[in-house]
Amino acid sequence: MALKRINKELSDLARDPPAQCSAGPVGDDMFHWQATIMGPNDSPYQGGVFFLTIHFPTDYPFKPPKVAFTTRIYHPNINSNDSICLDILRSQWSPALTISKVLLSICSLLCDPNPDDPLVPEIARIYKTDRDKYNRISREWTQKYAM
């Protein structure tokens, strides 16, 4: 079941890739993918190329994939362990969701962080109290780690 669904998502991604994103298997392992997200133009991550790993559980799509950044990023909802605080990867997961939708949700999280549900409270505080500083540090990290 999982492999059939993963193969379908791979062919859907090839046919209709989401804007600014790509994903596919690492070698022959269909349960381990690498994804790429281009830093959105309307964000301090513009120009950056961010890599992520995707691990599908054997009971996918009934359980969510594990998605993590491998490129460092300064963001209140992504911590230094590269975990992503995104409800659809946890409690709000649904088998109707796809990797394409997950990647688009991560893109929108880059443009529109959620400082009220942070993984990194200090970055959330800066985002809420000093947006210029947040944007400056985010751009610096993007230039240092994602270009």
UniProtKB/Swiss-Prot annotation:
Q: What is its EC number?
A: 2.3.2.23, 2.3.2.24
What compartments host this protein?
Cell membrane; Endosome membrane
Q: Which GO terms describe its cellular component?
A: endosome membrane; nucleus; plasma membrane
The UniProt entry, under Pfam families, shows: UQ_con
Q: Where is the UBC core domain?
A: 1-147
Enzyme class name: transferase
PROSITE patterns reported in the protein's UniProt record = UBC_2 (PS50127)
The record's annotation in Gene3D superfamilies points to:
Ubiquitin Conjugating Enzyme (3.10.110.10)
> Cross-referenced InterPro entries, in alphabetical order?
UBQ-conjugat_E2_core, UBQ-conjugating_enzyme/RWD
Which reactions is this enzyme annotated as catalysing? S-ubiquitinyl-[E1 ubiquitin-activating enzyme]-L-cysteine + [E2 ubiquitin-conjugating enzyme]-L-cysteine = [E1 ubiquitin-activating enzyme]-L-cysteine + S-ubiquitinyl-[E2 ubiquitin-conjugating enzyme]-L-cysteine; S-ubiquitinyl-[E1 ubiquitin-activating enzyme]-L-cysteine + [acceptor protein]-L-lysine = [E1 ubiquitin-activating enzyme]-L-cysteine + N(6)-monoubiquitinyl-[acceptor protein]-L-lysine
Annotated GO molecular function terms are: ATP binding; ubiquitin conjugating enzyme activity; ubiquitin-protein transferase activity
Q: Where would you say this protein principally sits, based on its record?
A: membrane
Recorded topology in the membrane: Peripheral membrane protein
Segments passing through the bilayer: none
Record-annotated active site: 85 (glycyl thioester intermediate)
Give GO BP annotations, semicolon-separated: apoptotic process; DNA repair; protein K11-linked ubiquitination; protein K48-linked ubiquitination; protein K6-linked ubiquitination; ubiquitin-dependent protein catabolic process
- UniProt-listed SMART domains: UBCc
- Write out the PTM section of this UniProt entry: Phosphorylated by AURKB.
Disulphide bonds in the chain: 21-107
Q: In which pathway does it act?
A: Protein modification; protein ubiquitination
Tell me, how does this one assemble? Interacts with SCF (SKP1-CUL1-F-box protein) E3 ubiquitin ligase complex; when Cullin is neddylated, the interaction between the E2 and the SCF complex is strengthened. Interacts with DAPK3. Interacts with BRCA1; the DNA damage checkpoint promotes the association with BRCA1 after ionizing radiation. Interacts non-covalently with ubiquitin. Interacts with E3 ubiquitin-protein ligase CBLC. Interacts with UBTD1. Interacts with RIGI and RNF135; involved in RIGI ubiquitination and activation.
Function of the molecule = Accepts ubiquitin from the E1 complex and catalyzes its covalent attachment to other proteins. In vitro catalyzes 'Lys-11'-, as well as 'Lys-48'-linked polyubiquitination. Cooperates with the E2 CDC34 and the SCF(FBXW11) E3 ligase complex for the polyubiquitination of NFKBIA leading to its subsequent proteasomal degradation. Acts as an initiator E2, priming the phosphorylated NFKBIA target at positions 'Lys-21' and/or 'Lys-22' with a monoubiquitin. Ubiquitin chain elongation is then performed by CDC34, building ubiquitin chains from the UBE2D3-primed NFKBIA-linked ubiquitin.
The text of the family note is: Belongs to the ubiquitin-conjugating enzyme family.
Name of this chain's protein: Ubiquitin-conjugating enzyme E2 D3
